Amino acid sequence: PKSTAAFDTTSILIDEALDRLESTYARVFGGINPDYPNLIRSAGTMAMEIIANSDALYHNVEHSIMVAMVGQEILRGKYLSEGSVTAREWVHFIVSLLCHDIGYVKGICPGDTATVAVINAQGETVALPAGCTGAFLTPYHVERGKLFVFNRFKDHPVISAKVIARNIEHTRFPVPEEGDSPDDSDF
């Protein structure tokens, strides 16, 4: 029988990107924490499949993959020049990059509905205008991304939701003036 499945370029793109992320980890760290490449793949697959449902024109799978690939090269350069990146830090950084714009996707946070999006940890919401895209969530996407990772990774035995959320917070733009310090002790 003939297959009725359509040619799915998004799945191919996701698989190829995750192959690269896994293989770069293996090239850098060898057999250290051999389960970590699978963590990258499983968290990355989850994030990319969710982001693939986004209707925001720019903050999509392609953008998230490009951010992860460039971020990985920056991290690899830091590792090669300083040697100061652990395998655990690597995994958290890559997962953070893959999840950094997940807050643009409608329906991902507990309490989201077809007409309302949760915008912070206090459960405040914003009404979604009829016909809006995920780009409407721009002012809230960092908080929503943090809510998502706290919900998704809260009980994970290896991935720290707190670390991922802190990294997502570092993507906020413009950079907040109040309380912001030039802390360069993390990624």
Regions found by a protein language model. Give the residues of each.
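Active-site flanking loop/helix segments enriched in acidic
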Residues: 42-69, 127-135
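Amphipathic, well-packed alpha-helical segments that form the structural scaffold of globular domains
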Residues: 48, 68-76, 146, 150
